[in-house]
Design a protein with these regions (language model features):
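Conserved glycine-rich cofactor-binding loop
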Residues: 16-17
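Conserved glycine-rich Rossmann-like NAD(P)H-binding loop of the short-chain dehydrogenase/reductase
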Residues: 32-47
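The beta1-alpha1 cofactor-binding region of Rossmann-like NAD(H)/NADP(H)-dependent oxidoreductases
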Residues: 42, 64-75, 113
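Conserved mid-core segment of classical short-chain dehydrogenase/reductases
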Residues: 74, 96-117, 136, 160-163
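Catalytic Tyr-X3-Lys loop
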Residues: 88, 109-129, 143, 147, ...
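A short, exposed helix-loop element centered on a Lys and neighboring polar residues
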Residues: 131-132, 176
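Alpha-helical segment proximal to the catalytic Tyr-Lys
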Residues: 136, 180-181
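Residue(s) in the substrate-gating loop at a strand-loop-helix junction
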Residues: 151
């Protein structure tokens, strides 16, 4: 356990699968309380929280959230404020899949505005809205860390990845702007 992290709080979007779930467990193992979002499976999310609390003795809470409605981050963070006394880390991780990406994932000539817009909303807009809310709380405690997960698809060609790759490039640019403007706050 990292004693420098004990008692701090992580907020992460998309904490029930893959990298997001691994982050939930890794932070909790280091004594960090965890608030994470999930899209649809409440029971699965609650099972993760129970497991995390039992294994690591930290507080864990899961919140339903539709990443295609990033403007609702304000309400989400207001709920998190009721359950946790601080936010030290924010990871923008959740991504869309299935019907929401139709027209955004595929060959360049098959891309459609709706699919591209959905991916942009779930990556760039979600990062902006979530990071703004997290930063407001971090400023009150003297700083924190904000991360957005990305991929190499913005750097190298990956077949059928034009929609995702260009949006990952956009969110990485946005992260740089946020870092420059928020860096002075810690």
């Amino acid at each position: 356990m990292d004693n420098n992290m004990k008692g701090k709080t992580l907020v992460i979007s998309g904490g029930t699968k893959g990298i997001g779930k691994e982050c939930v467990y890794k932070f909790a193992k280091n004594g960090v309380n965890v608030a994470f979002t999930y899209n649809s499976n409440q029971q699965f999310a609650e099972d993760i929280c129970k497991d995390v609390e039992d294994k690591f003795g930290v507080k864990c809470k899961a919140y339903p959230f539709n990443i295609l409605e990033p403007e609702k981050y304000k309400e989400l963070f207001e709920e998190i404020d009721k359950d946790f006394d601080r936010v030290d880390f924010f990871i923008s991780n959740a991504m869309i899949y299935g019907r929401a990406v139709v027209g955004g994932y595929g060959k360049f000539m098959k891309l459609k505005p709706r699919g591209l817009n959905n991916i942009y909303t779930a990556t760039v807009n979600a990062f902006v809205c979530g990071a703004q809310q997290a930063a407001k709380r971090m400023q009150k405690i003297g700083g924190g860390a904000i991360v957005s997960l990305s991929s190499t698809g913005n750097l190298v060609y990956i077949e059928n990845y034009a929609g995702h790759g260009t949006n990952k490039a956009a969110v990485e640019a946005m992260v740089k702007y946020a870092a420059n403007e928020l860096g002075e706050f810690g």
